[in-house]
Amino acid sequence: MVKTTEVVSEVSKVAGVRPWAGIFVVEIQEDILADEFTFEALMRTLPLASQARILNKKSFHDRCSNLCSQLLQLFGCSIVTGLNFQELKFDKGSFGKPFLDNNRFLPFSMTIGEQYVAMFLVKCVSTDEYQDVGIDIASPCNYGGREELELFKEVFSEREFNGLLKASDPCTIFTYLWSLKESYTKFTGTGLNTDLSLIDFGAISFFPAEGASMCITLDEVPLIFHSQWFNNEIVTICMPKSISDKINTNRPKLYNISLSTLIDYFIENDGL
């Protein structure tokens, strides 16, 4: 597992003029959050409005996953900007996508999966280079079998759907396509307000075990997508090609951060 100090040390190396990008992933550990004292202490690190949204979730799993996502958002923005998490000020776009209001050098995107929450963030050199990014983490458990594919026909383009029908492993291809589409909607910030069938990634029938990268132009913007397995889920990031060119990679480093590391971070920074 990556420790807080190692993450801070790694990020500190990019301070200055060189852009940087990274993916942070945290497992949703309900056994740790089942302790009432721990759950309530972590909740108190969040604004009251965020606490209310979490408590309004019906299931304990959803409350835990949303809490982990909020903590990861604070953690990631804090260690990359060097600001104490209590100094961070967030706002939301017209469709609810969060952004860091007091530091416009740091576009980021959040996603919640079945077992993990994830964050993709980019450290820009200047505000002139600020561009949105997107991330999604998709689970094969959302695939209901070939007999249910017809129910999702309107979600895919004709080429995508035909490729899916011909795939030898339709479960993986379904998960891959879903993560591609969702990462793009996280990039645009439009979410469910997007007609997913209009986002056409073509006929895909294979997803390599080592992951895959794709360069495609959508809505006149050249974009880089990179997808990879993380345990049993597929993580996909979306970023403008201009950002990929500046950071000189289409595969940012992924940091697997334990929930206990996150908790230690807030303790060390007087949040608990």
UniProtKB/Swiss-Prot annotation:
<dbReference type="GO" id="GO:0005737">
    <property type="term" value="C:cytoplasm"/>
</dbReference>
<dbReference type="GO" id="GO:0005829">
    <property type="term" value="C:cytosol"/>
</dbReference>
<comment type="similarity">
    <text>Belongs to the P-Pant transferase superfamily. AcpS family.</text>
</comment>
<dbReference type="InterPro" id="IPR037143">
    <property type="entry name" value="4-PPantetheinyl_Trfase_dom_sf"/>
</dbReference>
<dbReference type="GO" id="GO:0000287">
    <property type="term" value="F:magnesium ion binding"/>
</dbReference>
<keyword id="KW-0808">Transferase</keyword>
<dbReference type="Pfam" id="PF01648">
    <property type="entry name" value="ACPS"/>
</dbReference>
<comment type="function">
    <text>Catalyzes the transfer of a 4'-phosphopantetheine moiety from coenzyme A to a serine residue of acceptor proteins, such as alpha-aminoadipate reductase. Necessary for alpha-aminoadipate reductase activity.</text>
</comment>
<dbReference type="InterPro" id="IPR008278">
    <property type="entry name" value="4-PPantetheinyl_Trfase_dom"/>
</dbReference>
<dbReference type="GO" id="GO:0019878">
    <property type="term" value="P:lysine biosynthetic process via aminoadipic acid"/>
</dbReference>
<dbReference type="InterPro" id="IPR050559">
    <property type="entry name" value="P-Pant_transferase_sf"/>
</dbReference>
<protein>
    <recommendedName>
        <fullName>L-aminoadipate-semialdehyde dehydrogenase-phosphopantetheinyl transferase</fullName>
        <ecNumber>2.7.8.7</ecNumber>
    </recommendedName>
</protein>
<dbReference type="GO" id="GO:0008897">
    <property type="term" value="F:holo-[acyl-carrier-protein] synthase activity"/>
</dbReference>
